[in-house]
């Protein structure tokens, strides 16, 4: 007779995938009942599974081989169907997992034959692969679009100081203005600039090839805050202002917001001599409903 031991202290890996022991721990809470919870007076015996396993994943029915579920040892599915844990069954005898089964078929197809999901399912299947701790599937999905492109985008945004904070500020300002004005939308000004210093003086084309020589004490003359709600920049990367604008629209839209923007001019703040700020200013329109 085998006694089900208590849970080991929890330890997590930083890469998002879990070891088999961690997967078992997550499975045990709360999906796996203890011997007492299952209504038994004695410790549970190891559970045996048929060669062909009927599954009920949140109401979606699947059938697969036991060897498919155990294909990769360090996964939650392998731990669940190892025989060491009790898995409840539904009224038809299908083994029940309390999880949305919409994309479980894509997970099974990978376990069966290594097939990868279509591009439009990649994000959703990646979420399922994280839940079931299927490392090989995670690795391949992260080399597919759109996840691969998202890695590149995040590398660029990592150079942007306080990007997430400023993004939240845009949303909060737009919300407050819409509430105060009882309006469907709100507008705000956003400055996006790649370079800290102006390169050419204002309205002096003959000096286009010159840079203003300044001492350290002159630096304060160039330091100012444009009269806008939020500013992004500067940064050192090939990506330009339009790339950052695309990121802003993408991330705001991902929050369910309708976003429009247009350039409404530049900052005309006078700095020194013939030099003006000239940072571009964009008007963002956030529509709430």
UniProtKB/Swiss-Prot annotation:
Relate the protein's function as given in its record: May be involved in the control of excitability of cortical neurons.
**Domain called BTB: residue spans:** 53-141
Q: Name one GO biological process term.
A: protein homooligomerization
Q: Segment Disordered: which positions? A: 1-42
One cellular-component annotation, GO: cytoplasm
Assembly behavior: Interacts with CUL3.
The species this protein belongs to is: Rattus norvegicus
Q: Where in the cell is it found?
A: Cell membrane; Cytoplasm, Cytosol
- What are the UniProt keywords, alphabetically? Cell membrane, Cytoplasm, Membrane
Record protein name field: BTB/POZ domain-containing protein KCTD7
Provide the organism lineage as a comma list.
Eukaryota, Metazoa, Chordata, Craniata, Vertebrata
Q: Pfam families of this UniProt entry? A: BTB_2
Concerning Gene3D superfamilies, the annotation shows: Potassium Channel Kv1.1, Chain A (3.30.710.10)
Broad class of where this protein is predominantly found: membrane
Q: Does the keyword Membrane apply?
A: yes
